[in-house]
Amino acid sequence: VIIPNYNYARFLRQRIESVLAQTYTDYEIILLDDASTDDSTSILKHYSANPHVSHLEINSVNTGSPFAQWQKGISLSRGKYIWIAESDDAAEPSFLKKAVSVLKQYPDASFCFLGSHCIDGEGNQLTTDFDRWTSKQLSRSHNMGVFDGEDYIKHNLYWRNYIYNASGVVFRKQCFEQIKDLSCFSMRYSGDWLFWIEMAKQGMVVEVYEKLNNFRLHNVSTTKKGQKTGDGVREDIYIVNRIEHSLVNIGRQRKTVRHGSFYKEIKRLKVPTEIKEELTLHLASSLKANSSDYYVERFNKSFSWLMPWLITRDKDRL
């Protein structure tokens, strides 16, 4: 269990206690701090005496990337399965037991992803729902969906990072070790999205339709900062380009609609016009996209109920 932290002293105790309260007890805890300036280190040092804690690593200089801490924690880990338990989140006591049992049941699965309740800074449950499960997902037997990894990329991760919170995932370390390109760890905003794409290439993906994770929402996040500057969109374009080069069977209509969704996103960004123009040019050069893709995306979204063969992001989801 890797707990990477940066300036979340106010949530650390709840995070660590929610790990110690797990009904599955065969685990080690790796505590990481990325040069916090609050009271984090004293809290981490207090918990370092717990027999479950195998490592406490405190950086003297901030890395500038949350994903660099992921890589560090994974390199220190000794277990078969890895849970990156973000320091501001929490979990239900049955989370690990459920996740590990699923990975044992499906030995070809590279990771399993469980649902989340969204909570605020005080721990109150919010109505926000990032899972967005429909009858398609909830009608599956045993509250689970089991997918071929490449199909999961094509129909799900090509459109967006459905794996919206690392704290909701347990993955197989052996599958991580098969990844050859770890450029995701040097990214600032969307490295987690690329990470799950690379993990999905290593085996099957299992979704568990139970909300056993608690995902804390903040007013300011790294992702939102990236959207404000446009840098997050640049990283997203890079990721979609990677997918299109690695999967040959995406299909022309799916590509067109996906490119159109980028045009829509850029149009709606609250950034200066010159940044929008720069992003539009970058989109065209990177993905060979053009403005007509935007109108195809809008048409498909408006009329897919009438013409079921039209592809949209939501309809394409497995």
State what each model feature region is:
Residues 245, 264-318:
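Membrane-interface aromatic/basic loop that binds lipid-linked glycans or pyrophosphate carriers
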Residues 94-135:
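Conserved donor NDP-sugar-binding/catalytic core segment of glycosyltransferases
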Residues 92, 114, 134-236:
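Conserved nucleotide-sugar donor-binding catalytic segment
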Residues 18, 25, 33-42, 61-63, ...:
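A conserved acidic beta->alpha catalytic loop
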Residues 13, 38-46, 90, 94:
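Acidic helix N-cap motif at the loop->helix transition within catalytic regions
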Residues 59-77, 90, 98:
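Glycine-rich, basic loop-to-helix element that forms the pyrophosphate-binding segment
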Residues 8-21:
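Short, well-formed alpha-helical segments that are part of the catalytic scaffolds
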Residues 82:
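Short aromatic/hydrophobic "clamp" motif used to bind/position activated sugar donors
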